[in-house]
Amino acid sequence: MSDRLTLLRPDDWHIHLRDGAALANTVGDAARTFGRAIVMPNLVPPVRNAAEADAYRQRILAARPAASRFEPLMVLYLTDRTSAEEIRTAKASGFVHAAKLYPAGATTNSDSGVTRIDNVFAALEAMAEVGMPLLVHGEVTRAEVDVFDREKQFIDEHLRRVVERFPTLKVVFEHITTGDAAQFVREAPANVGATITAHHLLYNRNHMLVGGIRPHFYCLPILKRNTHQEALLDAAVSGNPKFFLGTDSAPHARHAKEAACGCAGCYTAYAAIELYAEAFEQRNALDKLEGFASLHGPDFYGLPRNTDRITLVREQWQAPASLPFGDFDVVPLRAGETLRWKLLEAEA
C-alpha cells in the first residue's frame, strides 16, 4: 500500500465561499487544494445576473492568497423571473459557467428560489441553446414530505421531466445522497452528471443522531441511512465519469450551528482532498481518486484538465478545533480528530 499519492490538481464543482470578511478565510482554504471551484450563488441578495456575478468574482479574486492561480467559476441563481436574455448575457461573459436551481426554501438562503419548475423553462431552453449547465439542488420542499424522502421525491416529480424535456441540457444533480439518485444518474443520458460530497461518503445519519445530536454533521440534503452511504461509495469509486467531486463545503459561524435551530452545512474545504482520500481508501480504491477528483468534472463541463499536480502523504495530523471565519469562528468537520492523509505540496 503506497504512502504517497500524486494527482492532477483537483477542482471543486460545488463550494460555498460566503462573502465579506469570511472570504479572507474560505478562499485560501479552497485554493490550497483546488485549481477551480464552482461557487454557489446563494448570497443575500443572491447572484442573479452577470453583473452581480462579476462583482462577486472580483471580491473572491481579491481574497486569493499571493501567487495563487485559483479560479472561481461563477454561477447564476435561478429565480421565477430569470430571463433567457440574462442567460445569454451570462454565457457571453466567459466567467459564468452554470445556473443553479434551488427550490424555494430547500436550503440556506433559498427563499428567492424557484417556486414552480415550469417558471424557469424559458431560461432552461436558453441554457440548452448556449451550452450552460443546470445545477440542481434536488429536494422537494412540501411540509408533508419526510426530510429523508425529499431527494427521491424530487427525482420522480421534477428531475425526470426536466431531463426528458431538455435532452441537450447538461444537468448536474448536486450533492446526491441516496442510492436512488445514484441509480438515476447512471441510467440517465450522458448529459446528466452528479457531485458527491466527502461527508456523505464518510458518514450516515447514525453519526449525526446516535448518542446525542451532533450539529456539525447537519447538512442539506441530510445524511441518510448507511445503505445509501454505501451506494454513494459504490458510485464514487466506480470510475463512471458521470460522478465527480463537489464538496458542498458550507461554513456557518459556530453560534449559528450550535443553536436551538442550527444552520445546515459542513465545513470541509480545509481538508477536502484528505477526507476524500480516506473515503476511497475504505474501498481500496485510491487508484480511482484522480478520475473522480481531477478528470471527470472538467470533462463534463467541457473545460481543460489542470496540468499541475498535488501530492498527498499518509501522515496523521489533528484537525483544528476551530478555524477563523470572518469575525467569528467555524467548527470544521472532524474538528479535533485525527486525519490520515495530508496534502504535502504542489508540483509545477
Curated annotation (Swiss-Prot):
InterPro entries tied to this protein: Amidohydro-rel, DHOdimr, Dihydroorotase_CS, Metal_Hydrolase
Superkingdom as given in the UniProt entry: Bacteria
Gene3D superfamilies the record matches: Metal-dependent hydrolases
Family in the record: Belongs to the metallo-dependent hydrolases superfamily. DHOase family. Class II DHOase subfamily.
Active site: 248
Residues holding substrate: 16-18, 42, 137, 220, 252, 264
Keywords per UniProt: Hydrolase, Metal-binding, Pyrimidine biosynthesis, Zinc
Encoding gene per record: pyrC
UniProt protein name: Dihydroorotase
Pathway involvement of the protein, from the record: Pyrimidine metabolism; UMP biosynthesis via de novo pathway; (S)-dihydroorotate from bicarbonate: step 3/3
Listed cofactors: Zn(2+)
BP-aspect Gene Ontology terms: 'de novo' pyrimidine nucleobase biosynthetic process; 'de novo' UMP biosynthetic process
UniProt modified residues of type N6-carboxylysine: 100
EC number(s) from the headed UniProt entry: 3.5.2.3
SUPFAM superfamilies: Metallo-dependent hydrolases
Amino acids binding Zn(2+) 2: 100, 137, 175
Binding site for Zn(2+) 1: 14, 16, 100, 248
Catalysis performed (reactions): (S)-dihydroorotate + H2O = N-carbamoyl-L-aspartate + H(+)
Co-factor remark: Binds 2 Zn(2+) ions per subunit.
Subunit text: Homodimer.
GO molecular function: dihydroorotase activity; zinc ion binding
Assigned GO CC terms: cytosol
Function field: Catalyzes the reversible cyclization of carbamoyl aspartate to dihydroorotate.
